[in-house]
Amino acid sequence: MSVVVTRYRGGGPQYMNASSTSPKPVVGEPSIRTHALHALAYCERLFYLEEVEELRVADAAVFAGRRLHVQLQEEGEHVELELASEALGLHGRVDAVKTREGTLVVYEHKRGRHAPGGDAPEAWPSDRLQAGAYALLVEERFPGAPVECRVRYHQTDTTVRFPLDAALRGAVVAAVARARLLRASRERPPVTQEERKCAKCSLAPVCLPEEERQVVGEERPRLFPEDDVRQVLHVATPGTRVGRAAEELVVTPPEGEGAPSRQPGRMVSALIAHGAVQVSAQALAYCVENDIGVHWFTSGGRYLGGLGGGAGNVHRRLRQFEALRQASVCLGLARRLVAAKLEGQLRFLLRASRGDSESRQVLASAVRDLRALLPKCEEAPSLEVLLGLEGAGAARYFGALPYLQGEDVDTRLRFEGRNRRPPRDRFNAVLGFLFGLVHREVEAAIRAVGLDVAFGFYHQPRGTAGPLGLDVMELFRVPLADMPLVASVNRRAWDADADFEVTSEHVWLSKAGRAKAIELYERRKRETWKNNVLGYSLSYARLVELEVRLLEKEWTGKPGLFATFRLR
């Protein structure tokens, strides 16, 4: 049979020595995908992430497997047959079953190499298990006929043949039983000890095996990707419509403002609608189906919310709720979060070398005060005390921030204190807009990981903003908003007249100003930065997702890496 090959995996012999040959009936329990047994034999953690937590990542091997599938269909190799067995507890799609001298031959196509053998090529244990499961389904569907398994390895142009014997039957039954047990558990299996498997696994960026091993002080190769090649699509012109045409998103501006543009869906990671932008139902459905987040902002830059497929299994959120109901867990995470935020502010102020003696004195005083707050964070007895420390740090930081601006900056763009809702000066108008983009970035990462934004560990519920989003966002205010904004103002990148709409009560970004702020933010996100703890470089966009995944590891794996990165 030729099943869609989603990635190359070797396999271990976990289920190949089982002796049971007669499965117990499965009543009222969902059956197991036959293809999932391949993942189970390769790595139990991989099976759990894909089948229980519903996390799947399409990498180059996935697309290569799909191309093989399409090629075989075009060549007439596929005759698809849907099979399911309540007795076996399995279901799957058989692509090719052929008759050879009275024997039903089940074919399995793999794009990679066969396993090394003695005198003849051998099938990998995970491939044997998968083919055996399909053979059992075929045997039940066509009783009486003998069944044989064949696995075709296209890279080496070899076919491995083996019978559906008692050992293989028992291995399939044992694997199904193990799969049911894992599916009923709330706990992820541990990271595999066979490290070579992680390098070839598409879910390594989700599993983070090398980061988990690093907690115990081991040196490991970097598996988390440096950047996401896809782009965020911002639509900010009022009256613009976003639709779908085949595999593309079509952006149609208002009449008289240009021709429609097309964006290949595979190259879009998120669609962001600013203000009065219409998104069709077809485009929304396409985005959800293809894991493209859709997010809405007001025209003034306030983040309203988002829609995304993400990972939908309840086990991940149950673990989150159980962990964050513990006051000690919340306090420990909050201590590290506030310390990381204060140290980020401190390090930004330390970068300043400009200014007269007064500026240097103000900056030095703020740095001393921020340093004095750091050890207090580690000893804070409650969240309320931490809030006070954070507030004291913010007062010293924002009091010193004007001294990071150059002397030749337009006075209308000078920072004279934090204000918002609505912003009353140009600097705060841009800063608030950037904070909204950071908030969106963080909430999108939280949804992608499968956590609940409404259940945090530090901030209390208020308004429509999810506490967990506000928690994680604290790590990124300085690097993704404060630093690029101050630098752009010092470069005189802003037009105090054309980029803003000023009234007696508030200041908003104009259309040109919004476009400039979006470009500033997206450019900053693409910049790479070397993580001081993990020791590898990645973009700021990937850093946001990494921090959320490291947060989840605080209660699902090896804790200790969340909120440990620091600015240089």
Swiss-Prot record:
Induction text: Part of an operon going from at least MXAN_7266 to MXAN_7259 that includes a CRISPR operon with transcription continuing into the pre-crRNA locus.
Top-rank lineage group of the source organism: Bacteria
EC number: 3.1.-.-, 3.1.12.1
Binding positions for [4Fe-4S] cluster per the UniProt entry: 43, 198, 201, 207
InterPro entries: Cas1, CRISPR-assoc_Cas1, CRISPR-assoc_Cas1_C, CRISPR-assoc_Cas1_MYXAN, CRISPR-assoc_Cas1_N, CRISPR-assoc_prot_Cas4, Dna2/Cas4_DUF83, PDDEXK-like_dom_sf
Record-listed Mn(2+) 2 binding positions: 390, 459, 474
Region entry CRISPR-associated endonuclease Cas1, spans: 232-568
UniProt keyword annotations, A-Z: 4Fe-4S, Antiviral defense, DNA-binding, Endonuclease, Exonuclease, Hydrolase, Iron, Iron-sulfur, Magnesium, Manganese, Metal-binding, Nuclease
Record flagged with keyword 4Fe-4S: yes
The keyword Glycoprotein is assigned to this record: no
Catalysed reaction equations from the record: exonucleolytic cleavage in the 5'- to 3'-direction to yield nucleoside 3'-phosphates
Cofactor(s) this protein cannot do without: [4Fe-4S] cluster; Mg(2+); Mn(2+)
Segments for region (CRISPR-associated exonuclease Cas4): 1-209
GO molecular function: 4 iron, 4 sulfur cluster binding; DNA binding; DNA endonuclease activity; exonuclease activity; metal ion binding
First-tier enzyme category under EC: hydrolase
UniProt remark on cofactor binding: Binds 1 [4Fe-4S] cluster per subunit.
Residues annotated for Mn(2+) 1 binding in this entry: 95, 108
GO terms (BP aspect): defense response to virus; maintenance of CRISPR repeat elements
Known role: CRISPR (clustered regularly interspaced short palindromic repeat), is an adaptive immune system that provides protection against mobile genetic elements (viruses, transposable elements and conjugative plasmids). CRISPR clusters contain spacers, sequences complementary to antecedent mobile elements, and target invading nucleic acids. CRISPR clusters are transcribed and processed into CRISPR RNA (crRNA). The Cas4 region acts as a ssDNA exonuclease, while the Cas1 region acts as a dsDNA endonuclease. Involved in the integration of spacer DNA into the CRISPR cassette.
Assembly, per entry: Homodimer, forms a heterotetramer with a Cas2 homodimer.
Annotated family: In the N-terminal section; belongs to the CRISPR-associated exonuclease Cas4 family.
Protein name, as recorded: CRISPR-associated exonuclease Cas4/endonuclease Cas1 fusion
Lineage start: Bacteria, Pseudomonadati, Myxococcota, Myxococcia, Myxococcales
